[in-house]
């Protein structure tokens, strides 16, 4: 509110000028002219500022309305006190016109308006002038009238604005909406009113009694202006009321929006629940449809079985009639046939018993072979471990012998070096002795004889030492030869041990190679088993895909049924039909659950079979690490036992085979054997099985395409009549 403080400061300055002009108006005319010029200038500035304030008030009205309600409670008491002081001040200013300066100062103090006080000499001069002679009063009466009129004209816009502000303040106070403190208008209004009253009192003091009429006119104008301000305050109150109403409407709209949002959320929740119910019903319908399809398929199968059984029943009835006829024709043939059949039955039972015994024997042989193979494998493993231990010991011994050989070689070299050193030393000693002997021989006289005896003694000693050294040399040579012989023995022993170790290593390598081959064969068998498992998985995946395709088709049908249900619900939805449908869907769901349980049990059984096969494969890997030929023979024997266990339709050992019956029996047995061999082949080679499955699938697909796309030709020619 800087503009308002500026406006208040200017109004204060203006009122100070008015007071000073009123005090000095009676003294000089030049001063009055100066006051009038300043008043007119300041009034123009005041009007411009008032326009700017009106614009600002129009712009800040919206913010003022929102902030006024918050400051009502805090400023209401201060406003009431200020307005009370204002009213008392105005009344006292009107009653005491002679003491206007004192009343003005009291009004300024009550309204908390700080203004410079008028100097006491000016007031004294004013009173002296008023109490002066009549001539001066009469001579200056015209001038004072003009000056008071000009002053009143100058003060009039200010008093109008002040009265408007005061009336606005009073109306807002009566309405209980203290809006003026929000804008800071209370103090300037009081100031302006007090100053206008002071100005009017000053004019009254200057003019005296004849100006009472003008004062009444001014009061009327002031009353009119107050009425206008009151109307403006009423408009402001109405605007505030409208703003409150709009705020209440806004709150109501917000509550409505919250209610609408809650209703929308409830509707969305109910829609989701209904969708979930529809989905559950559709799933139940799909389950019911799938159960109906299964029931239809079972019904068709039952019809086919019924037809086949009726056909077999008819054929049996025909055979029965024929048998009865044959029995009536000759019971002897029947008895013979019965005896032959009994004999064949006995033979079949005996062959069955023999096959069972042979199968048991084969199983026992297989168990014994497996035990032998395991024992051999354990023995071989122990032998390999012992051979490795022996090899390590021989290696360690050879290392020790090599170290001994190295030490002996080093000792021999040292002995050779010592022998050479000793030989050199002996040769040097002998040379020195010979030189000494020669020198002694060359001597003469007595000294020669003494020296000769001494030299002979020394020579004998030297010879004795030489003999000793020769003996030592011979001993050392014997030791050297003995060490050489030991070294040769060690080398020969090491070579023989190395050869034996090589032979053992070769044996171990051969055994390892055989085990590797057996391992590779078992790995190949494992790969075949894995391929079979993969084929089974692929079959399961294909069945899963087909079932998913069926599920999609059922979902499409469910969507159609949903549309039909929605149409029915729109037309007429009966509760009984829905309950019946729900009951049917629950039944289909129960059937589907039973089917799923059956499928899960089948899956578990397949998984158990697969685990059993893997366990058997691991056992085969563990048992046949070293005997592949034995395992193959066992497998062949198992296949032979399987061939023997397969029931043969007709035995070839019947001697009484003749005619068409014998040929048919041979053909049936050959077909049976071929089918058995084909089954064994397919069981052994899963790739061939896959190719056959693909071929059959393509063949059936081609047949279906031909049946569905074939259109028979329509011959419109008339028959020839033949």
Swiss-Prot record:
Q: Which GO terms describe its molecular function?
A: protein homodimerization activity
Q: Where, subcellularly, is it found?
A: Golgi apparatus membrane
Q: Where is the composition biased (Polar residues)?
A: 149-158
From the UniProt record, list the coiled-coil ranges: 211-622
| Residue numbers on the Lumenal membrane side | 711-722
Q: Where is the composition biased (Low complexity)?
A: 91-109, 195-209
Transmembrane residues, as ranges?
Answer: 690-710
- What is the purpose of this protein? Involved in maintaining Golgi structure. Stimulates the formation of Golgi stacks and ribbons. Involved in intra-Golgi retrograde transport.
Q: Which gene name does the record give?
A: golga5
Tell me where on the tree of life, at the top rank, the source sits: Eukaryota
Basic and acidic residues bias: where?
134-148
Against PANTHER family, the record matches this protein to: GOLGIN SUBFAMILY A MEMBER 5 (PTHR13815:SF7), GOLGIN-84 (PTHR13815)
Q: What is this protein called?
A: Golgin subfamily A member 5
What GO cellular component entries does it have? Golgi apparatus; Golgi cisterna; Golgi membrane
Which keywords does the record carry? Coiled coil, Golgi apparatus, Membrane, Transmembrane, Transmembrane helix
